[in-house]
């Protein structure tokens, strides 16, 4: 699924909008992706675009409380990934509600663990869907800032 999401971002970011699901399925199949993986990726994207905030407290977006990860979350999201999520929140890229949605979406991705690259991709897709990514410089800035953060 990760490879499909990377492919979609690389091919449709500049276009502004992705084609409809049927067109995407056809194009992804022609690109050589497996039908089951395509379905998983498109379902995941559909969930992402819904911004399902019903399971979260209404005031969470304004919260300044400290987040502690559960044992399950720590098994999937390593120290580097958790640090990156914390960094994004502290830098004002995401708010606490977006952080919770991000963690939920990362947990739902395929694979046993979530690499920093997967977390970055989820953030990029989320910001893209919310129209908070207006140009490529923001994308590049996110990666440059996060890379310099990782060196400290």
UniProtKB/Swiss-Prot annotation:
Residues spanning the signal sequence: none
Pfam family name, one: DUF494
Family: Belongs to the Smg family.
Protein name: Protein Smg homolog
This protein's encoding gene: smg
């Amino acid at each position: 699924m990760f490879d499909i999401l990377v492919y979609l971002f690389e091919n449709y970011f500049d276009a502004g909008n992705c084609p409809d699901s049927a067109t995407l399925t056809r194009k992804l199949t022609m690109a050589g992706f497996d039908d089951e993986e395509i379905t998983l990726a498109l379902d995941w994207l559909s969930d992402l675009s819904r911004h399902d905030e019903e399971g979260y407290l209404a005031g969470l977006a304004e919260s300044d409380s400290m987040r502690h990860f559960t044992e399950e979350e720590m098994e999937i999201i390593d120290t580097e990934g958790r640090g990156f999520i914390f960094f994004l929140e502290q830098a004002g890229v995401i708010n606490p509600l977006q952080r919770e949605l991000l963690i939920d979406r990362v947990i739902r991705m395929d694979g046993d663990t979530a690499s920093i690259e997967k977390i970055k991709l989820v953030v990029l897709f989320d910001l893209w869907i919310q129209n908070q990514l207006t140009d490529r410089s923001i994308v590049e800035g996110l990666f440059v800032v996060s890379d310099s953060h990782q060196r400290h």
